[in-house]
Amino acid sequence: MSNAIAVSEANFQAEVLDSTIPVLVDFWAEWCGPCKMIAPELDALAAETSGQLKIVKVNVDENNDLSARYGIRSIPTLLLFKGGTLVASHIGLADKNALLAFVKHHIYSLLPPLYTGAFITAYKHQ
C-alpha cells in the first residue's frame, strides 16, 4: 500500500492546485495490477524527494469527474503539476529512477533557488 495522500474532488484544489511544491498525481484503481506494481516505486520516489515533491493518489473508480476532467483513459496515469499547472503526464509503469528522471526533465528548470540538498543532487547525478 502506498504512503501517498489520497485525493478526491473535495481536496484536489488544496492538495494539488494550491500546493507550494510540485505534485505528482497517480490516477489508479484497486483492481489495476500495474497500479499496484508502481506503488512501491512511487513510495521510493516520495522518500527520496521528501518535502520537495508531493505524491498523491486519485482512485479513478471513486472520482469519475476528476478523472474525466484530466482525460484519464489508461491507468496508471501520472500527472505532474507545478504551481497549479499541469506540466506533464506519464502513462504506464516506471521504476523510481525513471520517475525521478521524468520529474527532473519537466520541473528541474522550474525549481526555485530554495530547492537544495538531496533532491537537486539526485537530479544532477541521474
Residue ranges and their predicted role:
Residues V60-L66:
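Structural microenvironment flanking redox-active thiols in thiol-disulfide oxidoreductases
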Residues N3, S8, W28, K54-V56:
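Conserved Rossmann-like nucleotide-binding pocket used by diverse enzymes
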Residues P34-T49:
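Typically the conserved alpha-helix immediately C-terminal to a functionally engaged Cys/Sec
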Residues S74, L79-L111:
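Non-catalytic, surface beta->alpha helical segment in thiol-disulfide oxidoreductase systems
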